[in-house]
Amino acid sequence: MTEQQSLEAIRYDHDHGQLKILNQLLLPSEYVYENVEGIEDGWQAIRQMKVRGAPAIAIVGMLSLAVELRSKSFTEMNEFDKFIRDSLEHLKTARPTAVNIFLACDLITKLIDNLIILGDEAVGVAKIEVIRHIEEMLHKDVESNKRIGSYGAEAILAKVPSKEKINVLTHCNTGSLATAGYGTALGVIRSLYGRDSIDRVFCTETRPYNQGSRLTAFELVHDGIPATLITDSMASLVMKKKDISAVVVGADRVLGNGDTANKIGTYQLAITAKYHKIPFYIAAPTTTIVLDDSKDIVIEERSHKEVTEIQGIPIAPSGINVYNPAFDVTPAELITGIITEVGVFSPSEMKSKLQTILNS
């Protein structure tokens, strides 16, 4: 299989401790892997959106720490502890809205809390244990996504039992390029396609970064899934005219009450789906869900150049003011169901059911 056929956003070599990421800024015209040799490389790759998607951001951030750990030696546990905590705090600043990296950092912090009591003589063992936990995150993400795909396909088809094949609409990129593999919302679509239940997928271009046209369309063509690319402003008409059975999107952060932060444009799709009585689903692993819904969601704002330029070519007059939030928040009342690796839940029941499942 050639590099162009494999569609891996992240390549990690356990034996040699090497990490490569597919530079998604160059897709679909160029297919280039770049080395990530430590934490700063990981931070830059995330910040510059060479890698994106909440699950992939977390995995690349953590693996960049694992790569740097392999090249370092420590003699004192306090020195090791400080390095880990400082590194985690730095990685969290790369993209503030995507929650997965915050939760991954919390898991490593809790691990360190347990390891530090072992004393200086165990610092080598502690380093190995942190690397092992990080590598497990990579493998768990793929399996989690496949379960999301299966649960999501079942939920969507349950609402359209009389149809042999269905049309679905998706937004941004939530596939192999946004995760460790398979995808969340696009994983649901892959599962539907594997059941011979897809007639056509409509994907939005997703301005201003065009993750839909550059990345999702790329994945759909690669997989041979029948697909049609539309501009963001066409979504309402497509819902009216093209017999859409479901809208399924990913998430960068889901609160316990079901409110969901996702790529800008998700909110308006949810409103339009509600008007047309089309089920609207969020597909996200439990690592994207924050059961404490009292915390505010920080919405990242990005450079005006993402709106006023395309590949350095101006498309707007100099001096125009630009508002460029990367995400919006969809209220829970617009969401039909939240698809996770442990089941599909309505927003109102999600918190209590997840607490029961995750604490059992």
UniProtKB/Swiss-Prot annotation:
It comes from the Eukaryota. One of its GO terms (molecular function) is S-methyl-5-thioribose-1-phosphate isomerase activity. Signal peptide: none annotated. It catalyses: 5-(methylsulfanyl)-alpha-D-ribose 1-phosphate = 5-(methylsulfanyl)-D-ribulose 1-phosphate. It is found in: Cytoplasm; Nucleus. GO terms for biological process: L-methionine salvage from methylthioadenosine. Pathway: Amino-acid biosynthesis; L-methionine biosynthesis via salvage pathway; L-methionine from S-methyl-5-thio-alpha-D-ribose 1-phosphate: step 1/6. The active site is at 252 (proton donor). Keywords: Amino-acid biosynthesis, Cytoplasm, Isomerase, Methionine biosynthesis, Nucleus. The record marks 172 as: Transition state stabilizer. One of its GO terms (cellular component) is nucleus. Its EC number is 5.3.1.23. Its main location: cytoplasm. InterPro entries: IF-2B-related, IF-M1Pi, IF_2B-like_C, Initiation_fac_2B_a/b/d, M1Pi_N, NagB/RpiA_transferase-like. Catalyzes the interconversion of methylthioribose-1-phosphate (MTR-1-P) into methylthioribulose-1-phosphate (MTRu-1-P). PANTHER family: METHYLTHIORIBOSE-1-PHOSPHATE ISOMERASE. HAMAP family: Salvage_MtnA. Belongs to the eIF-2B alpha/beta/delta subunits family. MtnA subfamily. This is Methylthioribose-1-phosphate isomerase. It comes from Trichoplax adhaerens (Trichoplax reptans).
